[in-house]
């Protein structure tokens, strides 16, 4: 999907003001992909499929999709799976599996789209797109603080194919050409790595290094470690309810969301009111975290609870500044807290949130 369909890879703890409200930053979209069959583009929602389904394995945080289109010469099926690694938080893994019931001329297009959707953007400048053999990398900086970000991407086809790289329409793309044998399945693995200037000194080099390491280890190894890490989390967090399977599923699905957005990758960060689902509520940390989420982590993951509490301690300086700004003594903690305790709440807030 392109920006008009609102895809977003939301960064935790990095904010920027361009126009309007200050909000979290969306990364260049390393998941951008589509298919051509016999020269014709096939993607949703532009081309209606004859069958389509999506599913989420919430126990392991894996998203699956399968889509079949009818073409002029037969049927083509695309199956994908995608996960943000719980074991190595800077990596996203994707797998494409393509099959057809005829000799189809296939072009799989996948890469990085730098034209992303923002509520009040754009938030990135000095955008650079570079290709390196089978890999590619996009670098940029945020407007306000000049924080560097890097998104690297690489693919590996398990079958003979012709590959090209192109830069076009704000995108850097792999074009993978091959011809299907009827009934055969063609698998392409893809890795996306993400680093920022808050993670490391040189995000670009770290992103490329981890990309090469992930390719060497292989998709299946990355997925196995990801699954194993999820199982470790469930040992301490899974809820079992006798006699009410639906209630049990609902509770564990909610726990999946909490586990997905826990900031285990750092030592001082909190969870925004909308998690990492987008830029609504300015990506700010409300007191919802302490009221509704903290108890769960205190009972199941004290190390993460410590990270959440340390965020409040570390934002004391921002609370002191806010109190002084309004003429008060002491500390006045933020209602909509961003980094450093900056309060993103306006003096006169929205009158119609919808």
Feature names for model-found ranges:
Residues 101, 114, 195-197, 298-302, ...:
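Short, well-ordered loop/turn and helix-capping segments at boundaries between secondary-structure elements
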Residues 9, 238, 294-295, 300, ...:
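Amphipathic alpha-helical interaction segments
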Residues 278-284, 289, 295:
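Segments forming glycine/polar-rich beta-alpha architectures that bind adenosine-containing cofactors
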Residues 26, 89, 247, 269, ...:
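Active-site-proximal structural scaffolding
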Residues 97, 251-259, 289-303, 315:
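Alpha-helical support elements that line or immediately flank enzyme active sites
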Residues 246, 284, 297, 354:
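Short, contiguous, pocket-lining structural segments
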Residues 1-281:
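Acidic/polar, glycine-enriched structural segments that form the non-catalytic walls/loops
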Residues 262-277, 300-354:
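Helix-terminus loop motifs that line ligand-binding clefts
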């Amino acid at each position: 999907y392109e920006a008009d369909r609102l895809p977003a890879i939301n960064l935790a703890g990095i904010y920027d003001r361009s126009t309007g409200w200050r909000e979290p930053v969306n990364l260049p979209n390393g998941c951008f992909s589509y298919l051509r069959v016999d020269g014709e583009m096939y993607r949703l929602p532009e081309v209606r499929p004859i069958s389509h389904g999506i599913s989420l394995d919430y126990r392991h945080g894996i998203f699956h999709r399968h889509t079949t289109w009818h073409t002029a010469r037969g049927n083509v099926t695309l199956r994908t799976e995608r996960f943000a690694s719980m074991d190595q938080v800077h990596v996203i893994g994707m797998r494409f599996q393509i099959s057809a019931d005829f000799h189809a001329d296939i072009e799989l297009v996948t890469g990085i789209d730098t034209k992303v959707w923002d509520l009040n953007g754009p938030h990135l400048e000095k955008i650079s797109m570079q290709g390196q053999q089978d890999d590619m990398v996009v670098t940029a900086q945020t407007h306000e603080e000049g924080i560097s970000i890097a998104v690297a991407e690489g693919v590996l086809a398990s079958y003979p194919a012709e590959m090209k790289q192109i830069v076009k329409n704000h995108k850097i793309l792999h074009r993978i050409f091959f011809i299907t044998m009827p009934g055969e399945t063609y698998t392409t693995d893809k890795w996306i790595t993400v680093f920022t200037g808050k993670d490391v000194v040189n995000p670009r080099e770290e992103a490329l290094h981890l990309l090469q390491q992930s390719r060497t280890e292989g998709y299946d190894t990355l997925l196995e470690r990801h699954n194993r890490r999820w199982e470790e989390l469930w040992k301490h967090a899974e809820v079992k309810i006798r006699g009410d399977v639906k209630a049990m599923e609902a509770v564990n699905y909610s726990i999946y969301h909490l586990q997905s957005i826990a900031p285990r990758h750092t030592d001082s960060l909190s969870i925004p009111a909308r998690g990492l689902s987008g830029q609504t509520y300015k990506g700010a940390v409300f007191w919802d975290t302490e009221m509704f989420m903290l108890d769960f982590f205190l009972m199941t993951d004290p190390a993460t609870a410590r990270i959440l509490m340390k965020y409040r301690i570390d934002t004391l300086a921002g609370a002191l500044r806010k109190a002084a700004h309004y003429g008060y003594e002491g500390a006045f903690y933020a209602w909509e807290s961003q980094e450093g305790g900056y309060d993103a709440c306006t003096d006169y807030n929205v009158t119609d949130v919808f």
